[in-house]
Amino acid sequence: MRKILILFTVLFVSNFYAQDILPLKERAKFVNKLQKERFNNLLPELMEKTGIDMWVLIAREYNEDPIIKTMLPPTWLNARRTTIIVFSLDSETKNFESVAIARYAFGDNIPSIWNKEKQPNQWKALKDYIVSKNPEKIGINTSSYESLADGLSKYHYDQLYNVLSPKFRKKIVSAEDLAIAWIETRTDLEMTAYSQLVEISSAIIREAFSTKVITPGVTTTDDVVWWMREKVIELGLDTWFHPTVDVQRKDESDLYAFDNNSKFDTILPGDLLHCDFGISYLTLNTDTQELGYVLKPEETSAPDFLVNALKDGN
């Protein structure tokens, strides 16, 4: 009998999926709560730590700054028109304020303060707000090294620069450290959710590496990749990056795991399977690599050394 040994518990996890993946409306409520905590509790700490007392983020609809994309309200799929949000932290009183200088409030968490009747020009309204706060530094998303911190377009930079007086132009600095800190720091609530993402990712891998999906001698690694993509869509999730599934065997095929031919390798008994897989859910992403072994016809279990290795590796 051709069998695949998965060196973690093989479960068909339809009940797991059904019970633990939230409907879209419930996801939106959770993300809104998550973002509120990040804006009100985490961001002031990061601004103080990185020495930025004002952070100006600007994006155009369908051309979003990568940082703004992480802040979008759950009911927004894109920025709207020209979206400007400003975070300010008083260095003395530690009062924190987040505002939108835009046509609309930025979801439930950031109100719009732009009075178009009083000041119809959006950029002048931004200038007026900056002047009222008189920050020591005006952080913007420009960076020579970090792509995620380099989301401000040349046009928007010019608009900001030109509307400010020389006094405030001198205060413009890169918010690179703050942007990266925002991206890399997770709250306790996010870590609770993240453990669920990891479980979902591993459950998909368990199913992908089972006889439900793989028939040794017939199924190719590329077949498994596309099954994983389809499974993610079926669950109402997103794939963070195109998965990789490759085989490692004595013929050194593992040396060519990322070339154009190896993705069509037929999975055989005795193969060590490797995958690199990630999903996106609740504004978080996973990047998971796990291994599995395909039993040879005469085997009832994997070699002991492999069992021990995969216990550590998986």
What does each of the following model-derived ranges do?
Residues M1-Q19:
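Bacterial Sec-dependent N-terminal signal peptides
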Residues Q19-N314:
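Active-site neighborhoods and metal-handling regions in enzymes and metal-associated proteins
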